[in-house]
Every structure is written in structure tokens, then in C-alpha cells.
Amino acid sequence: MTRFVLFISCFFLIDMIVECKKEGYLVGNDGCKYGCITRPHQYCVHECELKKGTDGYCAYWLACYCYNMPDWVKTWSSATNKCKGK
């Protein structure tokens, strides 16, 4: 029984450490946001899940916005914007 409680405690500890909180607009290799205006309804949800996010949608700027992604995922920022007007 003690081992079971220890196992459960470790599981929750690992879950808290690995918890993903990042959100934002997905960015491609060209530095531009993932466009979604002409894509199917579930396109952004699928792209966000590929990046290990929990959910996403086609946002106001007609780009994919994702929730709860790992910190390694690149997201768009006006300060680091490298998109050349595409």
C-alpha cells in the first residue's frame, strides 16, 4: 500500500513539473503565423495537437491560436516578428 501511495505521489509530482502553460499563435519556419482562412474547420485543432497543445482555433487575425503547449513550441510575438509580410 505504501508503494502505491508513493507511486501516485510521484505521478502527480511529475505531472506538475511537465505541465504545459504556453499559448499563442503558431509560427512556421518562415516566421509567419499559420494561416487558417481557407483551411477546414478542425485544421488549427489538429496543428495544435501536433505541437502537443490541448486545443486551438482559427483566431481573429485568421491564424491558428493554441493553448497549453510545451515551452519549446515557437509562437508569434510582435517583438520577434520575422514574417516578411506574407
From Swiss-Prot:
One of its GO terms (biological process) is envenomation resulting in negative regulation of voltage-gated sodium channel activity in another organism. GO terms for molecular function: sodium channel inhibitor activity; toxin activity. PROSITE patterns: LCN_CSAB. Residues 22-84 form the LCN-type CS-alpha/beta domain. The modification Lysine amide is found at K84. Its main location: secreted. It comes from the Eukaryota. Residues 1-20 form the signal peptide. GO terms for cellular component: extracellular region. Keywords: Amidation, Disulfide bond, Ion channel impairing toxin, Neurotoxin, Secreted, Signal, Toxin, Voltage-gated sodium channel impairing toxin. It is found in: Secreted. InterPro entries: LCN-type_CS_alpha_beta_dom, Scorpion_toxin-like, Scorpion_toxin-like_sf, Scorpion_toxinL, Scorpion_toxinL/defensin. Disulfide bonds join C32-C83, C36-C58, C44-C64, C48-C66. SMART domains: Knot1. Expressed by the venom gland. Belongs to the long (4 C-C) scorpion toxin superfamily. Sodium channel inhibitor family. Beta subfamily. Beta toxin that show multiple effects. It enhances the open probability at more negative potentials of human Nav1.3/SCN3A and Nav1.6/SCN8A, of the insect channel BgNaV1 and of arachnid VdNaV1 channel. It promotes an important shift in slow inactivation processes as a function of the prepulse voltage in human Nav1.3/SCN3A and Nav1.6/SCN8A and a small shift in Nav1.1/SCN1A, Nav1.2/SCN2A and Nav1.4/SCN4A. Has the structural arrangement of an alpha-helix connected to antiparallel beta-sheets by disulfide bonds (CS-alpha/beta). Negative results: does not modify the function of the Shaker B potassium channels. Does not reduce the peak of sodium currents in Nav1.7/SCN9A, insect BgNav1 and arachnid VdNav1. It does not promote a shift in slow inactivation processes as a function of the prepulse voltage in human Nav1.5/SCN5A and Nav1.7/SCN9A, insect BgNav1 and arachnid VdNav1. This is Beta-mammal/insect toxin To1. The lineage of its organism: Eukaryota, Metazoa, Ecdysozoa, Arthropoda, Chelicerata.
